[in-house]
């Protein structure tokens, strides 16, 4: 099953975010099922020095990925490990902080988390206000998608950012 999270809820006219403990749980789930993650980093962007020891070289065609937003950004890959989790949770506190908007944030952009076979497990497109889980059988993301503005969408193709059309998705039932 695939899932999508939107930054806005049309039913309640509210902005939606994944932050605090919900954000840390999302990262824990991504780290559980992923081996590598990638981000777009522009020169002098925050975290580039802290993440450098965990950077890996990857053949460009080994992983599915989205194109950059600008010519100055480069795709960097990092191995998943506890030290990286702590770097990410110490510096970034919300899913929408994965952006370099020139104002509040100077962070790496568009994180993708990849399984050991190179397929995408999770991606965040902060510029367009959407996050995606591409789950397989046995991958439990219920601790994340049971909270917030998540929708199921079995028709999400891997690594293609769909036009968010509400009729393609159905609201998930929230657990109390």
Predicted regions and their residues:
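Structured alpha/beta or helical-core interaction and ligand-binding surfaces enriched in interleaved
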Residues: 1-176
């Amino acid at each position: 099953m695939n899932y999508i999270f939107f930054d806005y809820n049309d039913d309640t006219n509210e902005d939606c975010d994944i932050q605090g403990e919900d954000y840390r749980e999302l990262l824990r789930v991504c780290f559980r099922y992923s081996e590598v993650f990638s981000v777009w980093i522009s020169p002098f962007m925050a975290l580039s020095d802290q993440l450098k020891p965990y950077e890996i070289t990857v053949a460009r065609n080994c992983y599915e990925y989205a194109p950059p937003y600008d010519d100055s950004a480069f795709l960097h890959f990092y191995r998943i490990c506890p030290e990286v989790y702590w770097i990410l949770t110490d510096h970034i506190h919300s899913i929408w902080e994965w952006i370099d908007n020139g104002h509040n944030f100077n962070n790496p952009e568009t994180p993708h988390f990849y399984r050991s076979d190179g397929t995408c497990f999770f991606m965040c497109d902060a510029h367009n206000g959407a996050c995606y889980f591409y789950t397989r059988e046995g991958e439990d993301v219920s601790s994340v998608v049971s909270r917030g503005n998540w929708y199921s969408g079995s028709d999400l193709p891997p690594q293609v950012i769909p036009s968010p059309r509400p009729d393609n998705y159905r609201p998930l039932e929230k657990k109390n």
